[in-house]
């Protein structure tokens, strides 16, 4: 890591939702997934998002990831109203400020770990040397520099998720959004991935937002947001990261 000193949350919200609703369909088929969500995420925080299926957590994460927009309400990112942006502007914001990690890794099967990590930089237009240098540095951060030339089939599930995390951080995003990042891993590999995310959060200051169904994984977060019936039911703060593991 670039620094051995932990970077605490600033207390200032990098993300602020006020009265956010999301409605799908119309008439008899209309469904309100979010019913007025208020939520502040401090810069540098590690937040776990929990709740039963249909509670609104995935819809909220899609909005926070600029993959969807609210039907009503306000979404501020770094103080800027996101609901005023068009599709192309939201795509630019995603590329510049956000990194994504998925349950299923979403790696290209026929390309090396290095080439997978380079992809966001390729889309951004970086030259070949800059891409390689940055991708190797990201792989080194996740402990996989020596596996740079291996394809996903030659890597374990935990290693594949590390490659996916390297791909997510290679652009130095402000926020990392992780959707069930340990869902396809055994308990030992799950803890390793959570320790890696917690380390990135503490030492790099990256804000981590993670959806999980597992309390043991949520214990790595400083803040746990509980959703129920399209609303934030409660927010637990002041967690000691990894306390229950």
Where are these regions (language model features)?
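ABC-family P-loop ATPase nucleotide-binding domain
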Residues: 1-23, 233-245
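ABC family nucleotide-binding domain
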Residues: 13-227
